[in-house]
Amino acid sequence: MPNRCLYISSFKDFLAENPLAVLGALHNNYHGEALTTTDEAWKGEIDILQRVLQPLKEEVAQIIFEYEIPRLGKRIDVVLLLRGLIFCLEFKVGQKDALQADVEQVMDYALDLKNFHRFSHDKVIVPVLIPTRHKSSTKEFKPSVSGNFQVRRSLS
């Protein structure tokens, strides 16, 4: 995956890695100078993922930061390849609410990945929006027309 992402690792190696080393790899592979907001977002993403993925450290799985969708130039914050599924994660660091535009953004990324990445055509892609200051979450899912999954909004 040359130049398609800024960082790629197995879950096990990512979870054992010092967060500053992961951040350093992101900076080293980034073309240009990362803004302070980008740097803070990456730090937040690394912290969250190293915490929540810990129970999965023995899984044969990969984590990819800043994956560029072929032919479109869009970058997905994080892609997780786990148990035959592709998780497309879009972080909104410091944000409390899941805005409709953000939901549409992560759904578009998942659809773009399915349409423009040949190894994803026949895979289930799970788009996940993560507003990091949101107080609740939902575990309710429903299949969408394209065979992907879409989060059903919770009423609580």
What residues fall within each predicted segment?
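Accessory nucleic-acid engagement/destabilization modules that flank
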Residues: 1-156
